Amino acid sequence: MRKLILISLCIFFLASCSELQEVRDIKNAGMPPKYYPEPPQTQVASEGSLWRNKASLYEDKKARRVNDLVTILINESTSAQKTASTTASRDSSTNYGLDTFFGMNTDFNIHNLPLINGFYKAGNVFSPSVKGSATSDFKGDGDTARTGKITGTITAKVVEVLPNGNLVIESRKEVIVNNEKEILVLRGIIRPDDISQSNTILSQYVADAQIYLVGEGTLGDKQSQGWLVRFLDKIWPF
């Protein structure tokens, strides 16, 4: 009895730790940053000259260096649907008869053996045979569909410039309304050529995009099941 209680407690704590880890990963999305940004560099005006070697006179005001900012226009929409159907049928029959047995007739030259109480006596011919049939049917159907959409705007910081010139960006936004916190996190890689003249870029052009939109507060708590229900769902075998 003690072993059973100990095993149940171990399963309970493992399931609880798993749930807490999943919640912690979502809430701490983007914290700390995956990439470590370089410290900002102060620009010092050149003495005796109006020319700055940090930027070109005809350079666009677009993000291209570490700690530069770029605005991401998030407009993600996904839709998937899959249908599967399987039908299988199998029908077989078997009929075997024995005519000779080691060169002898199956009646062993004994005729007129009557069948009395399940045994052959005089009056019937011994003629063994095997006959059987089998039928198997299977049918299965499945249908699944999923749709998701997220829109918004977030300004990200360039945290790294890759050797090929692509920019690694990362951003995190928190909005609190009536003790309800909404967290929007975005990470990814963009090309400088995809940035518009207004220093904006569509989320469709973000490679390896990781977009998290989670909420914390009373509404979020009401939308999630209690810890005991989640634990029972994990161990319930039926």
UniProtKB/Swiss-Prot annotation:
Keywords: Bacterial flagellum, Cell outer membrane, Lipoprotein, Membrane, Palmitate, Signal
Keyword check for Membrane: yes
PROSITE patterns attached to this UniProt entry: PROKAR_LIPOPROTEIN (PS51257)
GO CC terms: bacterial-type flagellum basal body, distal rod, L ring; cell outer membrane
N-palmitoyl cysteine-type lipidated residues: C17
Claim: DNA damage is one of the keywords in the record: no
Gene Ontology molecular function, alphabetical: cytoskeletal motor activity
Pfam families cross-referenced by the UniProt entry: FlgH
Bilayer topology annotation: Lipid-anchor
Protein's cellular compartments: Cell outer membrane; Bacterial flagellum basal body
Subunit note: The basal body constitutes a major portion of the flagellar organelle and consists of four rings (L,P,S, and M) mounted on a central rod.
Similarity section: Belongs to the FlgH family.
PANTHER family cross-referenced by the UniProt entry: FLAGELLAR L-RING PROTEIN
Name of the protein this chain belongs to: Flagellar L-ring protein
Organism whose genome encodes this protein: Thermodesulfovibrio yellowstonii (strain ATCC 51303 / DSM 11347 / YP87)
